[in-house]
A protein has these predicted regions:
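Flavin (FAD/FMN)-binding glycine-rich loop and adjacent Rossmann-like elements that form
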Residues: 157-159, 203, 265-268, 275, ...
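Loop/turn elements at helix/coil->beta-strand transitions in domains of secreted/extracellular proteins
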Residues: 165-167, 187-190, 258-261, 297-298, ...
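Beta1/beta-strand and adjacent pyrophosphate-binding region of the FAD-binding site
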Residues: 162-174
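Extracytoplasmic
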Residues: 1-160
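N-terminal Rossmann-fold NAD(P) dinucleotide-binding loop
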Residues: 177
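Conserved N-terminal/central alpha/beta ligand/cofactor-binding core
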Residues: 183, 189-190, 195-272, 277, ...
Length: 601
């Protein structure tokens, strides 16, 4: 049995010096941890180093929780490898070479004296080797569940730390969650916003780098959108330099609101229910320390994108494409499938004054002169995972996006007919955060469908206006012919007029005090194609924040706003909560959605 007296657990997120290793929590729902990633773009990253104490002399088994990330696609030796050393002496095992799944890889025995010691993790390639935790134990059995080990071997509090009670709890800090939090706060609610990243903005942050799309200040409620204009980036573009996305402006917008308490770097991992249909609070786990906090509230909103809060609370959710029999949508498949819009893994190169080398890899996708992409930037159409589970296989999807980017760039630089043109180009940035478009969607009291949009069926509770096509991505036909797993996409675009989304799509049918805003609202797969762009999501959040504050003022539930108080919400939507006198910057990526346009499908 592993105890504190015979075992030492060293989570990578708690290392004294992480060196060049990145702590990434985006897969915590599945792997139960943040991963430490050597994301050096082909150049080994600086060592991660930590100290630890041993109580008594002894021989310890060394285990590392890791995975072989290229194993799903290549039987060549993986590049995701690293070494582990104790007190300056590395063990013989090369880590990261085992299973494609997270597992404990054995590193042999280490003799340790009582007292202080140092452990070092040395990356070998810069190609995304990864680990979670390192375990030194005198127990001879293989380690088990990582969450149980943390609870037994780390000095974690046994009870979540109480962070108080709030009028409105926002889970998710993309533009939808930000607007929901700020809107409610400005109207008088005490708000908590919980965000598992260290930055705000979601897909529009410097971690993912998707430019804002769609229109603000349109439709019946033309004041909706001034709020996003206050903190949205002034410049357009996908896969640009980090400064374009103005993370500091977004952080400042949240910090400026005295009614908002921000919990960044916390992921909601459990819920506290009052009966089967009412949320009373959430348990959030620090993505570095694994300490838990408790946040109680009256009204909640799921702005996670993945419907994480709703799923924990037991709300009904869907993923994939509904069959034609469900809503009689003309573009729906005959039978339900798990196909979703994909995730983009973006990248770019930069021109240098001197030639720059890039490894000639043998473990990558087989690229040739016919399939190589002659480009210095991979943006939205570098899209993967349409046939995979966007939750359970999220890491595999992200990894495949990186795998093909490395493969294409290596061939382009070292073998292609264009290689002389690329001699001075350096592979400068590759996102390790998947830019998701779709995963789980929650059910509200109304599900918006393709028919509503095409037939322009207007409902009395219309609120936020769409401003995008029905933009349903598919694998690029030529790419799909050549590769078992396509990695380029195209858009199948259906022209639309601006359409007012029913308010009933923004609150949950099962959890009576929960709103939704963003890409996990109550729509069909096809309808998601127009509501999912970020400026539309932001206005959804703004409306949800207004409605949440009305719930506080009136002592009611989200459903009651629709049934009994929609006129009050309408008055708020006419006013908006943003400042209309600020310079108007959101004039880019505005498209004519009524025009016929093709993206090569």
């Amino acid at each position: 049995m592993m105890t504190k007296t015979n075992s030492i657990l060293l989570p990578g997120t708690l290392f004294d010096d992480k060196g060049g290793w990145i702590s990434d929590p985006q897969f915590m729902e599945v792997m139960k941890s943040s991963e430490m990633l050597a994301h050096g773009l082909g150049t080994p990253v600086a060592d991660a180093v930590t100290s630890f104490e041993v109580a008594a002399d002894g021989v310890y088994n060394l285990w590392v929780r890791t995975k072989n990330w290229t194993a799903p696609w290549s039987d060549k030796p993986t590049p995701g490898v690293f070494m582990v050393g104790v007190d300056g002496s590395e063990v013989e095992t090369v880590f990261g070479t085992g299973s494609e799944h997270w597992h404990w890889q054995y590193g042999g025995k280490v003799e340790l004296k009582s007292g202080a010691h140092t452990l070092k993790v040395r990356d070998l390639t810069g190609f995304d080797g990864r680990f979670d935790s390192i375990l030194l134990t005198q127990d001879d059995q293989e380690p088990g569940d990582i969450d149980e080990l943390r609870r037994s071997l780390l000095d974690l509090p046994t009870v979540p730390v109480d962070k108080g009670h709030f009028d409105f709890v926002v889970v998710g800090g993309g533009v939808a969650g930000m607007c929901a939090a700020i809107a409610a706060a400005r109207l008088g609610s005490k708000v908590a916003i919980i965000q598992d990243r260290k930055v705000f903005g979601g897909n529009n942050s410097s971690e993912v780098r998707v430019g804002l799309g769609g229109r603000l200040n349109i439709g019946e409620y033309k004041s909706l959108g001034y709020l996003l204009n206050e903190f949205g980036p002034a410049r357009k573009g996908n896969a640009r330099t980090a400064d374009v996305y103005e993370d500091e402006k977004k952080a400042g917008a949240i910090a400026a609101e005295s009614n908002i308490t921000s919990f960044t770097g916390y992921r909601v991992t459990d819920v506290i229910m009052d009966g089967e249909d009412t949320l009373a609070g959430v348990i959030a786990t620090n993505v570095d320390t694994y300490e838990e906090i408790r946040v109680m509230g009256d009204i909640f909103t799921d702005c996670t994108g993945d419907a994480g809060l709703g799923v924990l609370a037991g709300a009904e959710w869907v993923m994939g494409r509904e069959p034609k029999s469900e809503y009689n949508e003309p573009s729906a498949p005959e039978v339900h499938d798990e196909v979703t819009l994909g995730a983009s893994i973006q990248w770019y190169s930069e021109l240098r004054e001197e030639p720059v080398q890039f490894p000639d890899i043998d473990w990558g996708l087989q690229i040739n002169d016919e399939t190589v992409q002659n480009t210095r930037r991979g943006q939205w159409y570098w899209e993967v995972g349409m046939r995979n589970d966007m939750i359970q296989e999220a890491e595999r999807i992200r990894d495949y996006g990186m795998y093909v980017a490395y493969s294409n760039w290596s061939y382009l630089k070292n073998h292609s007919e264009y290689k002389d043109e690329y001699a001075n180009e350096e592979f400068a940035w590759l996102s390790y955060c998947a830019g998701k478009r779709e995963s789980r969607r929650l059910k509200g009291e109304f599900v918006l469908t393709e028919n509503d949009l095409r037939d322009f069926v207007i409902y009395p509770d219309g609120c936020v206006s769409t401003s995008w096509y029905i933009d349903d991505h598919e694998p690029d036909p030529e790419n799909a012919k050549r590769f078992k797993e396509p990695w380029l996409s195209c858009g199948k675009l259906t022209p639309l007029d601006f359409y007012p989304i029913p308010f009933r799509c923004l609150y949950n049918k099962d959890i009576i005090n929960m709103f939704m805003a963003g890409r996990n609202i109550s729509v069909s797969h096809l309808a998601l194609g127009t509501v999912r762009v970020m400026r539309t999501c932001a206005m959804e959040g703004e409306v949800v924040g207004m409605a949440a504050n009305l719930c506080r003022e009136l002592g009611c539930r989200p459903r009651d706003i629709y049934k009994d108080h929609f006129d009050k919400l309408q008055e708020l939507m006419k006013k908006g909560v943003g400042d209309p006198t600020m310079p108007y910057l959101q004039t880019y990526t505005l498209i004519d959605t009524t025009a016929v346009r093709h993206e090569d499908c």
